[in-house]
């Protein structure tokens, strides 16, 4: 059993789908990504984004493939950590963010995905897809576990959204990185 609760699933998306999603991102109007309350500070986070993208209303190749993959691999994460279903009902939230990091760009600051702000308080898990392999850094660093998850095409990573899993991007100075990230949240019943 994985004791750091960071689930890494390789080949969660096939290469041809990853390439289609990269084309999709490159064909969209990208905006400078902010953090938390939408504030922009390039020392903290420097990224170009398509956001927020609603799962149900998008109707794109992206939503279709991400949804199918998440349905399959959420079960795998649940099976690895069965106690997760003992607390409350949860499911993927209905939006996600597509991101493009040009060389030198990145999420520089250590952060977590549930910081107590009203717009993210119900996040319980994070999911992240890498759409391309970055051989010059480009992964995600979890300092609490001294663990780096490399950016590998088709890889899905799932981890808790809380302070126990603060993380930051590892900036590539030479290569572009494409990802999608979103969250699983508690369902108010």
Tell where the protein language model's regions lie, with residue ranges.
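Fe(II)/2-oxoglutarate oxygenase catalytic core
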Residues: 1-156, 164-189
């Amino acid at each position: 059993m994985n004791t750091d609760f960071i689930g890494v699933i390789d080949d969660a998306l096939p290469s041809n789908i990853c390439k289609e999603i990269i084309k999709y991102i490159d064909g969209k109007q990208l905006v400078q990504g902010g953090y938390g309350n939408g504030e922009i500070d390039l020392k903290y986070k420097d990224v170009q984004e398509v956001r927020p993208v609603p799962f149900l209303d998008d109707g794109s190749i992206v939503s279709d493939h991400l949804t199918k993959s998440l349905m399959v691999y959420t079960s795998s994460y649940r099976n690895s950590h069965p106690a997760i279903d003992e607390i409350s009902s949860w499911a993927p939230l209905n939006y996600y963010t597509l991101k493009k990091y040009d060389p030198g760009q990145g999420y520089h600051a250590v952060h977590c995905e549930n910081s107590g702000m009203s717009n993210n308080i119900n996040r319980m898990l994070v999911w992240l897809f890498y759409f391309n392999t970055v051989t010059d850094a480009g992964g995600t660093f979890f300092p609490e576990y001294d663990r780096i998850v490399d950016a590998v095409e088709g890889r899905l990573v799932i981890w808790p959204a809380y302070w126990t899993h603060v993380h930051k991007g590892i900036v590539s100075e030479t290569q572009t990185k494409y990802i999608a990230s979103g969250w699983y949240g508690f369902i108010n019943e």
